[in-house]
Amino acid sequence: MEKGLPHCKLAVAQAMVKAGKVRSTFSALAGGAEMGFDFDGMLAVVTALTAADFCMTSHADHQVWQDVYRPTTPAGEVYLKLTVIDELLIVSFKEL
């Protein structure tokens, strides 16, 4: 299932990054590294997101929604999936 609006407001997700309340899955770190991004570079992409980068919201578990963004970076287009529970989790970060 998916919906057309972000589950978490983008400003809230970006504030969590700035407050250090963020972590990443291993696969997202690996995908970022394949594109030339270290963790700080991935965070820079998240803080630069705009509403226009939003693609969809989906969930694998009906209690955990994931917001999907598709920003364009100097390294190319990124498929970026975020979820917020207690902190921001970068679930997916890979070349589109």
Model features per residue range: what roles?
Residues 1-96:
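Ribonuclease/tRNase effector modules and their secretory precursors
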